[in-house]
Amino acid sequence: MKSLKIASVLSILLLSLTVLQAKTTVTHLRCEWLENPIGLDAPHPRLSWRVETSRPGYLQAAYEIVVGANRAEIEAGKGSHWVTGTVAGTTIPLVYEGHPLAPFTRYYWKVRVRSADDSRWSEWSPIAYFETGMMELTNWRGTWIHDSPDYHIKPAPYFRKEFASSKEIVSARA
């Protein structure tokens, strides 16, 4: 009888330690269902994520999101465009409700979550980004390139420009 009590107490302690050791991570950050998209024209994009944990029966009870145009401020946990603070809820995807987004701008964001059964937050997710596009036709600044006003003629022209960069290229697009 005494050994049964000891075994029960040890089982409960081991289970408690397992729950305490379980790590919860936020992964697969998406904006409009895409990973780090560019050219978004949505003024209120939808943000989503996946919670990965070894804890059985885990249920997200709250989240916190920070969004800003500067990666360093997001790394510091501050966002210039949207800081939700603690929001109770499990809603995913979440609609962006921060300051208006500017066209042709890259925004960085991260999220952390809290479970329903304790008050511990997960670690912050890795930083993700999304980049806005034109947003409105009034932001169009280019002119059409063409070789003839006659639309019955020939295939499209081929444009190219070769160049040499003296520095390492960090990002490029055409």
Language model regions located:
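Short, conserved beta-strand segments of beta-strand-rich sandwich/propeller modules, principally
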Residues: 46, 106-110, 171-173
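Recognizes extended acidic, P/S/T-rich segments that occur
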Residues: 51, 58-106, 112, 116-124, ...
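Exposed beta-strand and adjacent loop surfaces of beta-rich binding modules
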Residues: 28, 46, 60-64, 171
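Pro/Thr/Ser/Gly-rich low-complexity, intrinsically disordered linker/stalk tracts
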Residues: 22-56, 126-136
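Well-ordered beta-strand positions in beta-sheet-rich domains
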Residues: 28, 62, 93, 124-129, ...
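Positively charged n-region of N-terminal signal peptides that target proteins for export
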Residues: 1-6
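Bacterial N-terminal signal peptides
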Residues: 8-18
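Beta-strand-rich recognition domains
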Residues: 136-174
